[in-house]
Curated annotation (Swiss-Prot):
Compartment(s) of residence: Mitochondrion outer membrane
Catalytic activity field: L-cysteine + 2-oxoglutarate = 2-oxo-3-sulfanylpropanoate + L-glutamate
Highest taxon, organism lineage: Eukaryota
Name assigned to this protein: CDGSH iron-sulfur domain-containing protein 1
Family label: Belongs to the CISD protein family.
Cofactor(s) it depends on: [2Fe-2S] cluster; pyridoxal 5'-phosphate
Gene: Cisd1
N6-acetyllysine, modified sites: K55, K68, K104
Organism: Rattus norvegicus (Rat)
Gene3D superfamilies associated with the record: CDGSH iron-sulfur domain, mitoNEET-type
């Protein structure tokens, strides 16, 4: 039972199924490229620090810093806002590469 010009319905059906499958494949690839990555990168960064505040902000006067200050950027420090090295474990567990913010006086 082969295709012939006598069966236009069968040829149209095959063309429609082929087009639908191609469209579905392109749609799936576009979804994987643009939307699947977004959903896994929108994880909560701050898991426990001042969760009752709408925004966590710390301000320090430059005179109060001394010669050097090291601040946490991974939100895992037990001494937050200061760094205690918790980013090392965080980086090992998540594959992240976050490190501390180091502020020091300019050497003259």
């Amino acid at each position: 039972m082969g295709l012939s010009s006598d069966s236009p319905v069968r040829v149209e059906w095959i063309a429609a199924v082929t087009f639908a499958a191609g469209t579905a494949a392109l749609g799936y690839l576009a979804y994987k490229k643009f939307y699947a990555k977004e959903s896994r990168t929108k994880a909560m960064v701050n898991l426990q620090i001042q969760k009752d505040n709408p925004k966590v902000v710390h301000a320090f006067d430059m005179e109060d810093l001394g010669d050097k200050a090291v601040y946490c950027r991974c939100w895992r420090s037990k001494k937050f806002p200061f760094c205690d090295g918790a980013h090392i474990k965080h980086n090992e567990e998540t594959g992240d590469n976050v490190g501390p913010l180091i502020i020091k006086k300019k050497e003259t």
